[in-house]
């Protein structure tokens, strides 16, 4: 992908001799939405750290567009309840940000009403929008969103997915999004990558938003959601390692003579 914002080539990371990521190929282009899914312990957080430049891979390479501006939205933040920190002061921790810039970013995500609120008092959905506004303050070419809809109900997920799509359209930025849901993803996703230490499979989410049964289940939210069908050609054991074809895996249903 010649116009990629970021490209990972055969990236591998090991901790204490144990492979956490193995032979990862991944690229994100301007205007493209890539959703990364996988079970707990699959290496999603490690991959994000490599993308952000917080971790140097032991193998392979990470190429970034020169002077690439990245906006990062973490899963969550912990703020001491006794710390006198308003949303405005939190956003102004980003260098060069004044009240006007903070207000503009909050307006873009629909959260301008909380600008003077103590950050500890805002709702979970409002916090997600504040974190997204903070990511936008860098005028990013690439948005990295770590489980942006975690802990949000289906209606809230739909609103956030629609917002992310509008931001992509408005700014033309690429989006790398980590999702905790293995099957239900944002319908605007261009590519889904299933990770479990290595890339198990990848492809486009299936557009099922017009299916009557899907619409009945999710109502007006159906248009923002899509189902991703995995097409693995292998299985993993409980530790994440690939099981060799024909190998026996011990479990509760084993019968030994």
Curated annotation (Swiss-Prot):
Domain spans labelled ABC transporter: 6-221
Domain of life, source organism: Bacteria
Pfam families linked: ABC_tran
Alphabetized SMART domains for the sequence: AAA
GO molecular function, one term: ATP hydrolysis activity
Keyword Transit peptide: no
Keywords for this protein: ATP-binding, Cell inner membrane, Cell membrane, Ion transport, Membrane, Nucleotide-binding, Translocase, Transport, Zinc, Zinc transport
Topological relation to the membrane, as annotated: Peripheral membrane protein
Residues where ATP binds: 38-45
Known catalytic reactions: Zn(2+)(out) + ATP(in) + H2O(in) = Zn(2+)(in) + ADP(in) + phosphate(in) + H(+)(in)
EC number: 7.2.2.20
Subcellular location: Cell inner membrane
Quaternary structure annotation from Swiss-Prot or TrEMBL: The complex is composed of two ATP-binding proteins (ZnuC), two transmembrane proteins (ZnuB) and a solute-binding protein (ZnuA).
Functional note: Part of the ABC transporter complex ZnuABC involved in zinc import. Responsible for energy coupling to the transport system.
Family the entry assigns: Belongs to the ABC transporter superfamily. Zinc importer (TC 3.A.1.15.5) family.
Name of the molecule in the record: Zinc import ATP-binding protein ZnuC
Taxonomic source organism: Pseudomonas entomophila (strain L48)
């Amino acid at each position: 992908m010649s116009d990629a914002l970021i490209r990972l080539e055969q990236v591998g990371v090991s901790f204490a001799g144990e492979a956490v990521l193995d032979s990862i190929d991944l690229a994100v282009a301007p205007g493209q939405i890539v959703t990364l899914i996988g079970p707990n312990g699959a290496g999603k957080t490690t991959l994000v750290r490599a993308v952000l430049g917080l971790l140097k891979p032991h193998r392979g390479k990470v190429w970034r567009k020169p002077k690439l501006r990245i906006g990062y939205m973490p899963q969550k933040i912990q703020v001491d309840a006794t710390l006198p920190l308003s949303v405005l002061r939190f956003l102004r921790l980003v260098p060069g940000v004044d009240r006007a810039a903070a207000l503009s970013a909050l307006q873009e995500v629909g959260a301008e009403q909380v600008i003077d609120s103590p950050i500890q008092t805002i709702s979970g959905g409002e916090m997600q929008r504040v974190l997204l506004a903070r990511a936008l303050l860098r005028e990013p070419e690439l948005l990295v969103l770590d489980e942006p809809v975690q802990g949000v109900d289906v209606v809230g997920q739909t609103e956030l997915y629609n917002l992310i799509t509008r931001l992509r359209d408005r700014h033309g930025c690429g989006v790398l999004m980590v999702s905790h849901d293995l099957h239900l993803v944002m319908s605007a996703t261009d590519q889904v990558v299933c990770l479990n230490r290595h890339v198990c499979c990848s492809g486009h989410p299936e557009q099922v938003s017009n299916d009557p049964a899907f619409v009945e289940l999710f109502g007006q939210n159906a248009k923002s959601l899509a189902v991703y069908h995995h097409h693995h050609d292998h299985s993993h054991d409980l530790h994440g390692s690939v099981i060799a074809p024909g190998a026996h895996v011990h479990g509760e249903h084993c019968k030994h003579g």
